[in-house]
């Protein structure tokens, strides 16, 4: 599909764009939201947790952040809040599916209800949000961007994280499937694969020398990542600079998977 509109001088500008970012109350999602805001996007933050810190950080860099409280395991609530966000903002241009949860337990005792919730939050919500975004982009005739947060565990097996691994393997497959179906409409669908990133979810491992030392030794860049390491790649995949990239999963791991 040939791009008919004239290229902007700044390929990375997101001025005038509205970006939905799920799971952005803390950590990686917060870093994504701040990065997009720095490039000019208005952030529509979707999360079940308190988003006040994200709003503050976005506003500190001169951005605008609108908050939507939503349980992403609830499909009816997703539908309601999506339509509210469209109604209040007229258009959405970027979707960042970042919401996720993890439960560590042996597969021998892993509870069915927990498995179902992990899949619902990490994978099913991404499908439902992408479906809504794709229809919205198609109706508007715009080149929308959908970016999914995958993981090292999209290709690794892991231990005691069977639900999470299934959800992240599914996220990679979903990204590829959506990219094939939506490319004819000019919609790009890509994924990020975070490595070991220092967030509240990983702090216990980071602070345990026996666990963190071998991880550091395998990372060529010699350190764990931080949420702000995602700002640049978020802007790239959300902007017209990546208009000929779709179906890709880009590691953000300091070289971990290369080793």
PLM region descriptions:
Residues 135, 180-184, 243:
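Alpha-helical segment proximal to the catalytic Tyr-Lys
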Residues 130, 167, 175:
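Active-site helix of classical SDR
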Residues 12-44:
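Canonical Rossmann dinucleotide-binding motif of NAD(H)/NADP(H)-dependent dehydrogenases/reductases
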Residues 41-53:
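Conserved glycine-rich Rossmann-like NAD(P)H-binding loop of the short-chain dehydrogenase/reductase
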Residues 151:
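Residue(s) in the substrate-gating loop at a strand-loop-helix junction
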Residues 223-252, 256-257:
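C-terminal substrate-recognition "lid" of short-chain dehydrogenase/reductases
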Residues 106-107, 111-119, 215:
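Substrate-binding pocket helix/loop in short-chain dehydrogenase/reductase
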């Amino acid at each position: 599909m040939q791009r008919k509109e004239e290229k902007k001088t700044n390929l990375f500008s997101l001025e005038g764009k509205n970006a939905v970012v799920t799971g952005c109350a803390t950590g990686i999602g917060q870093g994504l939201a701040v990065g997009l805001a720095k490039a000019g996007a208005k952030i529509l933050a979707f999360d079940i947790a308190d988003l006040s810190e994200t709003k503050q950080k976005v506003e500190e860099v001169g951005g605008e952040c609108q908050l939507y409280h939503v349980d992403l395991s609830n499909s009816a609530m997703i539908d309601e809040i999506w339509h509210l966000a469209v109604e209040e903002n007229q258009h959405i241009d970027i979707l960042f599916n970042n919401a996720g949860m993890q439960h560590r337990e042996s597969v021998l005792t892993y509870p069915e209800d927990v498995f179902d919730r992990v899949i619902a939050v990490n994978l099913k919500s991404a499908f439902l949000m992408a479906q809504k975004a794709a229809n919205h982009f198609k109706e508007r005739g715009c080149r929308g961007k959908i970016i999914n947060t995958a993981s090292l565990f999209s290709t690794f097996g892991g231990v005691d994280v069977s639900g999470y691994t299934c959800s992240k393997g599914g996220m990679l497959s979903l990204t590829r499937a959506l990219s094939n179906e939506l490319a004819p409409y000019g919609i790009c669908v890509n994924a990020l694969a975070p490595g070991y990133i220092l967030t509240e979810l990983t702090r216990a491992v980071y602070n345990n020398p026996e666990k963190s030392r071998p991880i550091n030794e395998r990372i060529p860049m010699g350190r764990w990542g931080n949420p702000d390491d995602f700002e640049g790649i978020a802007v790239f995949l959300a902007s017209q600079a990546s208009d000929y990239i779709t179906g890709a999963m880009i590691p953000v791991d300091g070289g971990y998977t290369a080793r």
